[in-house]
């Protein structure tokens, strides 16, 4: 690249400038970026500096024990070992998980072992060239302000890396006991005595989920899921799915094909670090991936139906469906909306169940205060097996919910803009001149989320409430020059024959809202 830049290659020169212009920013999500040389990329020097800053932050607060985990991405094990070396050199007690493992195991281990913090080296579902660095504190939850700012300041204060002690040993590599403790807890999520007969087709998408998913299903008493052979082994290059996000079109094609060949009842996919879980089921017109909001409603329903008198709080992000709040209210449960991200959902006092529309679910917050694709898969399998024994399906439960609470249809729209400055300008325009109509529905209220309120911290976003139970939430992406729009339309359902008509009406309205948003802003749309 240096040679190409010296020879006048403009793209090579721009890449070099970007790599060395500033530092990779540490925030509530920690670090995440492409692996390459330079302070604005993920590499050993950036990780060493981050670990040194975290060590200083923890030492100033009396924290000592830190659990470090890693996934199977390129260099994840090296970044984890470097972190342990820096923490040990700073006088802290570093405990390294025994092998590449899912993120939920790290979140579980923090409180199980009484640690002051945890670090997970993963880029979750990002492309293969990326890696990341997530930080949790002693509550087992990802950091929120002001901890992110304070840790970032400690990182900035780190001097020359040559002066940072890095012993070659001295930290503890944990045994399998912590993994077995997690599995025992996960396997207890399905209640004893509930049906277990179910055929599941599963893919870990080249990530670290397979071994623990299979072990958890076995310990819980389910038949072994059928696994997509071509995607079974951890492979940091993700050869069959260059963008290994289960939400992306086409990513579930292989596992759905396996389900069709084998007559499976349920499709499950975990993302590469297994903290998220996608599901698909067969409908009369073919297999379809369930939206995150649909799975969230199903999991909440299963918790309620199997535990009469259930107590606690249900929570989901403000960009997720309003259906969860209606389900909670109907069963005497409190409901709390939060900002996006499990760092907020997991902090809700008294949480019993939380989810976000981006296929993240927390079904056992007493053990894992983060999204956990493995326990979510187990709870969904319990519901599917119970329904199978009754001669019913997950689709039937979704229909029941539509009849009781109205048909809730959610969708998303990404509005791409040239740069972050343009995104900010569009948000200003939407604040100053909000639309009066969207999809044929009157906008009767605009909430400026930068002002906070309703128990929510301030965040950059807008919420439009529509006449007839609908809403649009718009917020800028934190990583890309685009605006994310989250849409929901609610259609009443009367008799059974109204369901199909309600679905059609909702779809027409959502598509009209999308067109209105894109047209009003005069910019192209993307998924």
Where are these regions (language model features)?
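N-terminal small/polar loop signature for handling phosphorylated ligands or for N-terminal nucleophile
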Residues: 67-130, 221-279
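Gly/Ser/Thr-enriched, mixed-charge loops and adjacent short helices
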Residues: 15-24, 131-259
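Conserved phosphate/anionic-ligand binding catalytic regions in large, soluble enzymes, centered on
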Residues: 20-40, 123-126, 204-216, 355-361, ...
